[in-house]
UniProtKB/Swiss-Prot annotation:
Family: Belongs to the universal ribosomal protein uS8 family.
Gene3D superfamilies linked to this entry: 3.30.1370.30, 3.30.1490.10
UniProt GO molecular function: rRNA binding; structural constituent of ribosome
Keyword vocabulary terms for this entry: Ribonucleoprotein, Ribosomal protein, RNA-binding, rRNA-binding
Gene encoding the protein: rps8
Entry function: One of the primary rRNA binding proteins, it binds directly to 16S rRNA central domain where it helps coordinate assembly of the platform of the 30S subunit.
Pfam families noted in UniProt: Ribosomal_S8
Biological process (GO), any one: translation
Protein name per the record: Small ribosomal subunit protein uS8
InterPro entries for the chain: Ribosomal_uS8, Ribosomal_uS8_CS, Ribosomal_uS8_sf
Cellular component GO terms, alphabetical: ribonucleoprotein complex; ribosome
PROSITE patterns given in the database record: RIBOSOMAL_S8
């Protein structure tokens, strides 16, 4: 059965593979947003290298895990966040102030909420990881 929410499928696959203490995982299918989210997670140090493998069924990601994800998930519906409202959403989704990050999509691309607050821009919440 095809995945209806590709981003939620990506986060669930990462979380389940981390919970099983595996080093690598395969995520099907792929999307451009998934590439940007994985790039953000890699830049933050939650995952290692990842590779997009194109096949005839929507492609797949091959992701190397670093055993640094305790919990992650997609945020649905995608809530709109103004530039000064990140602390409210941190309290909703993250366990403490300095632990973890919210993944935000903005008009300047996908980034962490720390980077978006530093730039002074808002966007839509699409996921969290800690």
């Amino acid at each position: 059965m095809p995945a209806t929410n590709i981003l939620a499928n990506l986060f669930v696959t990462l979380y389940n593979t981390e919970a099983r203490r595996r080093g690598d995982c395969q995520v099907y299918p792929t999307s451009k947003l998934g590439v940007e989210v994985l790039g953000t997670l890699k830049k933050a140090g939650y995952i290692g290298e990842f590779e997009h493998v194109e096949d005839s069924r929507g492609g797949k990601f091959s992701v190397h895990l670093l055993a640094k994800i305790t919990k992650c998930g997609a945020i649905s519906p995608r809530f709109k966040v103004k530039k000064g409202e990140y602390t409210f959403w941190e309290q909703q989704y993250l366990p403490s102030y300095d632990r973890g990050m919210l993944v935000v999509t903005t008009n300047q691309g996908v980034m962490s909420h720390h980077e978006a607050a530093e730039r002074g821009i808002g966007g839509f919440l699409i996921g969290y990881v800690y």
